[in-house]
Amino acid sequence: WKDTINNISSKPKDRYEKSVSFEDLKTECEIYNRRILKKNSKFLIFLLHKTKIMNFFQTINIKLYDHNKSYNYSIFKGLVELENSDPDVSMHSQSLAFIFKNEFGFDTLTVNGCFESDKKNFSKFVKTFGIGTLNASGLSFSLGLLAEPQIIFSFFKRLKNVAKNLI
């Protein structure tokens, strides 16, 4: 195992083959938002978004380094191009498309680490896209979920553990 570990840096790196266009990302985003709002309580999502309670479902600034541009994402406004500004998270357009196309996309991204973020903004990232993980596990964000404190506790415990391990 020592040889394998010592030779990691000499191995070829995986590279993204091509960028996903803004138009395609916007389309995937619209499909994603419709799916999320259909499976979950639009009222609760809107309430948390507007009241900013614990910063759930807030607009997030995503820099796509292959586009060399930043975009704001919101569950209600979709994906909007903007002038480059301080991003909450940076990634390749294929990673963002993967989140939009797959309920488990966000979870996969946290495992493969194909994004950059600091601890504070990672928390915001989770609170914006983590709902897909909830849906992938067969649950929905609704008043009924509030009666399941062990699930809520598990979510926050997992968020804390992942954030603690960020560099």
Q: At which residue positions do the language-model features occur?
A:
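Feature captures hydrophobic
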Residues: 1-167
